[in-house]
Amino acid sequence: AEKLGIKCYDKELLELAAKESGLCEELFASQDEKPTNSFLYSLVMDTYSLGYTNSYVDMPINHKVFLAQFDAIKKLAERESCVIVGRCADYALEDNPYAVSVFIKASLDERVQRIKRIYELNDSKAADLIQKTDKRRASYYNYYSSKKWGEAKSYNLCIDSGLVGVDGAIDMILKFIELKEKNMGKDI
């Protein structure tokens, strides 16, 4: 985002979605990328999707939060060029011809080293944090999108930052955008 001179939205998206939806910002923080993966919960709470009710009022709170974020992502992309981290942004923008979806991966060992530096954790705690975060993100993404988290066909570009480094990943993304703009005949 910095090299493109555009904003990057991560947690900031929660505040924006809360403002635009009128829902309490704390709801977004508590539900952030945390769907339920309980089949029983879905059966009980998702009765509205089976035709028993069709009211937004009756919708489970995690669905309301997701829809508010989904709408905020679409509106944000219409207003400005930006980078949006996570929250199924690629799914929300899959019909936007200017969107570029990127998945960046690295080996667990490389990620542990990075997390240790950032959060001052030992190997075990860093690995545990990574695995729990990955599980939560995959569950959220797979639950709300028609895609699979981390699967190459779900994204325009997948990069192994362990092989090319952070700067190499940035260069690859910038080159991808440059080539897409050239192919489209306009700036994205």
Please annotate each region the language model reported:
Residues 33-46, 122-167:
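Small-molecule kinase domains that catalyze NTP-dependent phosphoryl transfer to phosphate-bearing small molecules
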Residues 95-118, 123-131:
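Conserved phosphate-donor/acceptor-positioning beta-strand/loop module used by diverse small-molecule
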Residues 1-5:
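A conserved segment at the C-terminal end of the G1
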Residues 70, 166-174:
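Short, amphipathic alpha-helical "lid/cap" segments that border enzyme active or binding sites
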Residues 13-81:
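ATP-dependent small-molecule kinase phosphotransfer cores
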Residues 76, 88-96:
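RNA pseudouridine synthases
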